[in-house]
Curated annotation (Swiss-Prot):
This is Small ribosomal subunit protein uS13. PANTHER family: 30S RIBOSOMAL PROTEIN S13/40S RIBOSOMAL PROTEIN S18, SMALL RIBOSOMAL SUBUNIT PROTEIN US13M. It comes from Nocardioides sp. (strain ATCC BAA-499 / JS614). SUPFAM superfamilies: S13-like H2TH domain (SSF46946). Part of the 30S ribosomal subunit. Forms a loose heterodimer with protein S19. Forms two bridges to the 50S subunit in the 70S ribosome. PROSITE patterns: RIBOSOMAL_S13_1, RIBOSOMAL_S13_2. Residues 101-124 have a biased composition (Basic residues). GO terms for biological process: translation.
Length: 124
């Protein structure tokens, strides 16, 4: 199994797809990296040589924030929004959708499991 920037890449997948296992690299960035390094995107990970892996690693580390650095930056951005008291920061603190989605129905992923509320009791 090839290891790139701290992530094990699956051996039997095409390198174009395998690069997307790295946090911060999607299909478009994977294609950009392969084009910049001149590596054939149709090769499988186990077919890559050491020099190709070194080229890929150097290109990724030089040009992109990935994995831990990117996760820290995203968390810092969220913390900053919470501290300055922006609308988005308040939504993050309350655990509600941040980008204007409806919350009367849906939003279950963000709000968590449904809490049942008891109805009114009938008077005798």
């Amino acid at each position: 199994m090839a290891r790139l920037v701290g992530v094990d890449l699956p051996r039997d997948k095409r390198i174009e797809i395998a690069l997307t296992y790295i946090y911060g690299i999607g299909r478009t960035r994977a294609q950009q990296v392969l084009e910049a390094t001149g590596v054939n995107p149709d090769l499988r990970v186990h077919q890559l040589g050491d020099e190709e892996l070194v080229k890929l690693r150097d290109e990724i580390e030089a040009n992109f924030k990935i994995e831990g650095d990117l996760r820290r930056e995203v968390q810092a951005d969220i913390r900053r929004k919470i501290e300055i008291g922006s609308y988005q920061g308040r939504r993050h603190r309350q655990g509600l959708p941040v980008r204007g989605q409806r919350t009367k129905t849906n939003a279950r992923t963000r709000k968590g499991p449904k809490r049942t509320v008891a109805g009114k009791k009938k008077a005798k």
